[in-house]
Regions:
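Catalytic lumenal/periplasmic loop and adjoining terminal transmembrane helix
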Residues: 27, 70, 238-241, 247-255, ...
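Transmembrane-helix signature of polytopic, membrane-embedded enzymes
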Residues: 6-12, 104-126, 145, 162-167, ...
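Transmembrane-helix motifs of polytopic, lipid-linked glycan transferases
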Residues: 91-111, 149-153, 304-308
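Membrane-interface transmembrane helices that cradle and orient dolichyl/undecaprenyl
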Residues: 150-169, 203
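Short helix- or helix-capping micro-motifs
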Residues: 120-125, 132, 148, 152, ...
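Short acidic/glycine- and proline-prone juxtamembrane loop motifs at membrane-interface regions
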Residues: 31-32, 129, 135-142
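Loop-to-helix entry region of an early transmembrane alpha helix in multi-pass inner-membrane enzymes
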Residues: 68, 72, 80-102, 121, ...
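Transmembrane-lumen/periplasm boundary regions of multi-pass, lipid-linked membrane glycan transferases
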Residues: 47-50, 66-68, 72, 79-82, ...
Length: 534
């Protein structure tokens, strides 16, 4: 009866998520990289429609280092759907995010039952770094969803080693192929399955001959997965197979970015190449909701308490999740890659973390079952923490991806000052509305200005402003002569140009973006200055 309740709760949550996506996907601002990514998708479409003769996609900026799975679909949908292209991308990205949540539910269900599956789904659903990001982080969330499905099939396959049914191998290969069709980071999924097979050989096989047979049989069973993964990667990332060293070039670029950029670490400006090894851990500890962290703490304590009673040979599915969690985290600690934008580039580990945390909370309920008062207190704590997170996400809408928990600072304003704020400049969607309203009011009082064109400087990509402004405004690169200035407050870019503040986009008393009127400024006051590092 209880299990059926959790199943109904999960389905109800899925339904609520679908409604949420359909009602809000048009409310999210365009992110910095969306234009170049969409152009890349259009160029890939030209590559195929031209019979492989138009290869401009592989000379466009550095986008050839990435797969175009998402962008190719978006470029195709643009031709057939009667929607604005950016709305198409945001809806498609949200669909990927939703698919990732299905994978988390199914994975946790396979490991620990309906209650844990519901809790894992709920945890991911209230994580702003996933649900808030899934509309605008088109590359990160789509990749994370594919990796979540690769993990799901890895879990299923772990129960069948060394003789893996063909249909499972093909499904695993498809998930990995789609992931590689987005980023070279999909190679992590390949590493996961390799580690799993090696651990299975060590735990289950007897003599050396048996171990070799077990390993060989596993390899043979996985060959179809490798074949379909390679084919899908080649379709969505053709550059990868156009040179024998292309995959290695992409892998190197993944871990060592070659450009000058800063990030925020507890109030300090830090070059992305000099971030501490704990950068990702620091951001996970403040970007995940408190209830999520409680789940991770619970699963860690459970493992410590029951470590001696765990039969590793029977725990390959659980080991699969552990591999998916530990491999990228250990990679960051060892390789110390250039990192920025908080957890963005490692969004793909959030599903595995949600699985572990959901199981942790579920097991904690079981352990506390004999202790009524403790159990009720634990449940009350979980409900309060979850409610607080949901309220915070509601207030932040549509900027849920900026969510920070209470460990990040005394309040949200302090958190987005000391850590990365609106790095995608998505809040410009509301900043442009403030500017248009300001000019509307001015033109009502001064009808002679109706035909005037105003120049606007934007601390973001130009199209993020022009996409929402009408013909009265012209986005300019000449910041000195600009009439108006729009910027998110991330990294103090709003302070680069002076001007009278005529509009502020705020959430939880924290400014996310500003609009400045610069028309009355003269001389040196019109010149840009370096963003202060305070």
């Amino acid at each position: 009866m209880t299990l059926n309740l959790y199943k109904k709760l999960s389905y109800a949550l899925f339904a609520a998520l679908v409604i949420f996506i359909l009602l809000t996907f048009k409310q999210y601002g365009i992110s910095n990289d969306e234009q170049v990514q969409h152009v890349y998708g259009q160029l890939l479409l030209k590559f195929y429609s031209s019979g492989f003769t138009d290869q401009s996609a592989f000379m466009y900026k550095n986008l050839y280092l990435y797969g175009g799975f998402f962008d190719l679909i978006a470029a195709f949908l643009e031709k057939i759907l009667p929607l604005w292209v950016w709305d198409i991308r945001h809806l498609l990205s949200a669909a990927f995010g939703f698919a990732g949540m299905i994978a988390v539910y199914k994975s946790t269900l396979e490991l620990s039952g309906e209650r844990a599956a519901f809790l894992a789904l709920l945890l991911l659903a209230i994580t702003g770094a996933w649900t808030g990001a899934m509309f605008t982080h088109t590359k990160d969330v789509s990749f994370g969803a594919c990796m979540a499905w690769a993990l799901y099939y890895t879990i299923i396959i772990s129960r069948h080693l060394p003789r893996i049914p063909l249909h499972l191998a093909l499904k695993l290969g498809a998930a990995i192929g789609f992931a590689l069709g987005l980023r070279i980071g999909g190679a992590f999924a390949v590493i996961y399955i390799i580690f799993l097979v090696l651990i299975a050989v060590w735990l289950n096989a007897g003599t050396l001959k048996n171990k070799l047979d077990y390993c060989w049989q596993s390899i043979l069973s996985l060959l179809p997965a490798g074949a379909i993964a390679f084919c899908l990667m080649a379709i969505f990332w053709p550059w990868a197979v156009m040179g024998i060293d292309h995959i290695l070039i992409a892998a190197k670029s993944f871990s060592h970015f070659a450009f000058d950029m800063n990030t925020m670490v507890d109030g300090e400006f830090v070059s992305i190449g000099d971030v501490p090894r704990t950068y990702l851990f620091n951001y996970l500890s403040i970007r995940l909701p408190e209830i999520f962290l409680l789940g991770l703490l619970s699963v860690a304590l459970m493992l410590i308490i029951k470590i001696k009673g765990i039969k590793l040979a029977n725990s390959l599915p659980e080991i699969s999740v552990a591999i998916a969690l530990l491999t990228p985290l250990l990679f960051v600690l060892y390789d110390r890659p250039a990192l920025y934008n908080g957890v963005r580039h490692f969004t793909f580990i959030l599903p595995a973390l949600a699985i572990a945390a959901g199981i942790g909370l579920s097991k904690a309920f079981d352990i506390l079952m004999p202790y009524k008062e403790l159990r009720l207190s634990f449940i009350a704590c979980c409900i309060l923490l979850t409610s607080n997170t949901i309220y915070t996400l509601y207030v932040l809408h549509p900027y849920q991806y900026l969510y920070y928990n209470h460990f990040a600072g005394e309040n949200f304003k302090e958190a987005i000052h000391d850590w990365e704020g609106d790095y995608w400049s998505s809040s410009l969607i509301d900043a442009t509305k403030l500017l248009k309203n300001y000019i509307d009011a001015e033109q009502t009082k001064l009808p002679n200005k109706h035909n005037q064109v105003y120049s606007v400087a934007v601390c973001a990509e130009a199209f993020q402003g022009s996409a929402y402004l009408d013909k009265r405004f012209n986005i300019t690169e000449d910041w000195v002569t600009a009439d108006f200035y729009m910027s998110s407050t991330n990294m103090n870019c709003d302070k680069v140009l002076k001007g009278k503040v005529i509009g502020t986009v705020e959430r939880l008393n924290a400014p996310l973006a500003i609009v400045k009127d610069r028309r009355d400024l003269t001389g040196e006051d019109r010149r840009p200055h370096a963003a202060p590092r305070d």
